[in-house]
Amino acid sequence: MTLKTIEGTFTAAKGRYALVVGRFNSFVVESLVQGAIDTLVRHGVEQSELTIIRVPGAFEIPLVAQKVAQRGEFDAIIALGAVIRGGTPHFEYVAGECTKGLAQVSLQFGVPVAFGVLTVDSIEQAIERSGTKAGNKGAEAALSALEMVSLMAALEAK
């Protein structure tokens, strides 16, 4: 017996992509943005199909992602930002609400939302995850978005 498998690919994921980007910790976030753009273009997405929307920080990303999803113009949203732990509970609130809000947007509107918001304990970890030792999480989020766009199309075609 053969099990039927439906999955997305990276090659059949043409579409329009919104990158919702938090400006806070921009020294890290800009590397995430570049990684995402490079990955999308390398997989055949035209730069004219990309829109970058900048917000103050990670906490504001879900609201803007919601507005973007509501408009129905984009096949996927890529959320990019960086929340670095400090000495107060602020980190937990921002990271948790950003994560929860983005999941809610995806479920509410049926639009893939790729999570490329770093939630790290130190600046060193942020730097590692934005293009050095631990890869580029912006590029990984872009790959996730590509795959999800393709998967959603496959599911709708069935």
Swiss-Prot record:
Q: Which residues form the active site?
A: 90
Q: Which GO terms describe its cellular component?
A: cytosol; riboflavin synthase complex
Describe the reaction catalysed, as an equation. (2S)-2-hydroxy-3-oxobutyl phosphate + 5-amino-6-(D-ribitylamino)uracil = 6,7-dimethyl-8-(1-D-ribityl)lumazine + phosphate + 2 H2O + H(+)
The EC designation for this entry is 2.5.1.78
Could you tell me which InterPro entries the record lists for this protein?
LS, LS/RS, LS/RS_sf
User: Where in the chain are disulfide-linked cysteines found?
Assistant: none
Cross-referenced SUPFAM superfamilies: Lumazine synthase
Sorted alphabetically, the Gene Ontology BP terms of this entry are: riboflavin biosynthetic process
Q: In which pathway does it act?
A: Cofactor biosynthesis; riboflavin biosynthesis; riboflavin from 2-hydroxy-3-oxobutyl phosphate and 5-amino-6-(D-ribitylamino)uracil: step 1/2
Molecular function as annotated in GO = 6,7-dimethyl-8-ribityllumazine synthase activity
Residues that bind (2S)-2-hydroxy-3-oxobutyl phosphate: 87-88, 129
Q: Which UniProt keywords apply?
A: Riboflavin biosynthesis, Transferase
> Which residues take part in binding 5-amino-6-(D-ribitylamino)uracil?
24, 58-60, 82-84, 115
- List, alphabetically, the Gene3D superfamilies matched: Lumazine/riboflavin synthase (3.40.50.960)
User: Is the keyword Ubl conjugation assigned to this protein?
Assistant: no
Q: Which family is this protein grouped under?
A: Belongs to the DMRL synthase family.
Main function: Catalyzes the formation of 6,7-dimethyl-8-ribityllumazine by condensation of 5-amino-6-(D-ribitylamino)uracil with 3,4-dihydroxy-2-butanone 4-phosphate. This is the penultimate step in the biosynthesis of riboflavin.
Q: How does it assemble?
A: Forms an icosahedral capsid composed of 60 subunits, arranged as a dodecamer of pentamers.
- What name is this protein filed under? 6,7-dimethyl-8-ribityllumazine synthase
| Protein source organism | Azotobacter vinelandii (strain DJ / ATCC BAA-1303)
Q: Source taxonomy lineage? A: Bacteria, Pseudomonadati, Pseudomonadota, Gammaproteobacteria, Pseudomonadales
